């Protein structure tokens, strides 16, 4: 088992990475917990619900299951209220603990529910998709979507632990694996050129879910994110670079309708768009744009964005958490392994859109 420590002003906690972590979840529950509520969806519950509940039952606490509808389309206030309804109907108090068993949607919604229920209760992240394991479960970002923008209603709220069972990835559809790998290669692009090169060299092993390659990719991704979050928990500076590809990607998700593309697919395509914009606005080498496009294609993600029309693209990107004073800010790369967040000239954005949409 690998352990990565996350240390932030909002809380320090371990990330446990390895096979069989689902069977050890009882160890992650605080001793003074009065009850445990497992928040999940029908798909994950059918695969792992009974196993997780058996592990949690060893704590001697009452264990409640809350099942939410599956998918990004249900990441909203209406679905969030299903969590609150169950917690209140079952009289869970401030010492109850939530367990987020699922992908990014479940993790984000459970974390947000924990942040606001009775003004804050504890929760544990148990991510079951690759994307959630390497990205959304780490760092304390929690949110629901609004019809006008993705993740616009939320809070920074850290879990007490993240439990990553690498064996659960064997049940993931290939498309979900590709979506998760987009976030993996992102860390190399923004923070670690050596890791980017390793991803290029090992893309076949990663797509095949080769255990050693996968374990290293997950650990290194968590290490890099933990370093950034430890320096900038609330995204007031450095943490913004973790949003590489997300300004374009969120526009794709909003423009097509949540759930049409997976989040990781939109981010992967958005990284190609960000690379093109970086050649115009940050001096990114043109040859490296092709490297980005090639690796995004090799992990199985789209490299051509939908043609939403330039004006609609710009309007969608205005509804972004990084927009300041009406000015859209992008994560740009001077070179592989280095990134910065700043505004880009609209003419450059339009050119990048022309090069990357169809």
Swiss-Prot record:
Q: Which reaction does it catalyse?
A: 7-phospho-2-dehydro-3-deoxy-D-arabino-heptonate = 3-dehydroquinate + phosphate
Identify the EC number(s): 4.2.3.4
Q: Where in the cell is it found?
A: Cytoplasm
**Full protein name:** 3-dehydroquinate synthase
Cellular component terms (Gene Ontology): cytoplasm
Q: What does the UniProt cofactor note say?
A: Binds 1 divalent metal cation per subunit. Can use either Co(2+) or Zn(2+).
Q: Which cofactor does it need?
A: NAD(+); Co(2+); Zn(2+)
Alphabetized CDD domains for the sequence: DHQS
Output the SUPFAM superfamilies linked to this UniProt entry: Dehydroquinate synthase-like (SSF56796)
Enzyme's top EC category = lyase
- What gene, per UniProt, encodes this protein? aroB
Name its species. Bordetella pertussis (strain Tohama I / ATCC BAA-589 / NCTC 13251)
UniProt binding sites for Zn(2+): 183, 246, 263
Provide the residue positions that the database annotates as binding NAD(+). 70-75, 104-108, 128-129, 141, 150
Q: Which family does it belong to?
A: Belongs to the sugar phosphate cyclases superfamily. Dehydroquinate synthase family.
Pathway(s) per entry: Metabolic intermediate biosynthesis; chorismate biosynthesis; chorismate from D-erythrose 4-phosphate and phosphoenolpyruvate: step 2/7
InterPro entries the record matches? Dehydroquinate_synthase, DHQ_synth_AroB, DHQ_synth_fam, DHQS/DOIS_N, DHQS_C
Instruction: Set out the biological process GO terms recorded for this chain's protein.
Output: amino acid biosynthetic process; aromatic amino acid family biosynthetic process; chorismate biosynthetic process
* NCBIfam families documented for this protein: aroB
